[in-house]
Amino acid sequence: MLTRKCAIITNPGAASRNKEVEAMIPVIKQFYNEDCIEYIKAPGTLEGGDVMMVGDHFYVGRSARTNEEGIRQFIAILEKYGLSGSEVKLEKVLHLKTGVNYIENNKMLVSGEFVDKPEFAKYEKYVIPEDEAYAANCIWMNGKVIVPDHFPKVAQIVRDAGYEVILVDTSEYRKIDGGLSCLSLRFTAQK
């Protein structure tokens, strides 16, 4: 997880993902000073798909892959840097960003269990229809929103919210439950 103040190296809940962490550390060190790199340590687990940044606040989904201890460590690290975080309990989805994504300007795309979550009541919510729920996992970048291709309702909802849409084919990633947010790290380098 990359914030504007620090990098937080996760400890994935799926053992098959641990090599990803090992591969990322040398790359992260190219962009963040060593004293601003923090680590989630066992028994804590945390996966990036369970973390959604809204300004300086981070919503963290408790899931099969992100546990209470991982969330506790993550929020403690955030607070060390003057940031904040809060837990969101998940009921049905693999990761938080499977069903909710912040697209800036106080706007969120929500689907399924996130439509009525009290944690998100203060945001302007754009409800994604269940038949296109996969595409709730969109990415805001530089005033535009990247949307999975072949989900015309979601693309129109995003346009109606006032954004230019960039369509990306994610069909191969979808086969392994991957979404757009799984494929990117967006950050401003410290160095």
Please describe what each predicted stretch is.
Residues 1-191:
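The feature marks the mature, well-folded catalytic cores of soluble enzymes
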